[in-house]
Amino acid sequence: MSNRYRDASLSPEERTEDLLAQMTLDEKLAQLQCHFFAHGDLQKDTRYGIGQISTLEFRQALSMEEASGIQREIQETVMNNSRFGIPAVFHMEGLCGALVQDATSFPAGIGRGASFDPALEEKISEIVSRQERALG
C-alpha cells in the first residue's frame, strides 16, 4: 500500500489520485454516507470509513465538554476503522444556533429576515460558527 497520499510535498491532485486508486468501491461509497451515531452500530457502520457524522444527537450532551468528548471518541473509531485513517466531517445544523447544551439560541430565519439587518445576521453567524468550532 502506497502512502503517497500522505506526502504533503505532492500536489492535492497527485495525493487524491493515489488515494482513490487504492480505495475499494465500498470505501469510496462510505465517504458519501452520513452516520447518526445514536442509531445503529458505529463499529459496523464505519468498517469502510464514513464521510460524515451527524451531530444532531449531540444536543443530548449535558455540556460542550461532554459533546466534545463524544466527538473525539467517534472520530477515533472512524479513523481506526478506515484503512487510510480518513477522518469524518462532523455536520451540525446552525440555523438558529449550535445544537448543543449552553449554546446561544437565535430566532428563526424568517424573523431575522424581517429585520432587514444584514449586519445583525453576520453577527449571528459569527457567534454560531464560533460556538460550533469550540466543539472541535
Say what each PLM segment does:
Residues 1-136:
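N-terminal beta-rich core of secreted/periplasmic extracellular enzymes
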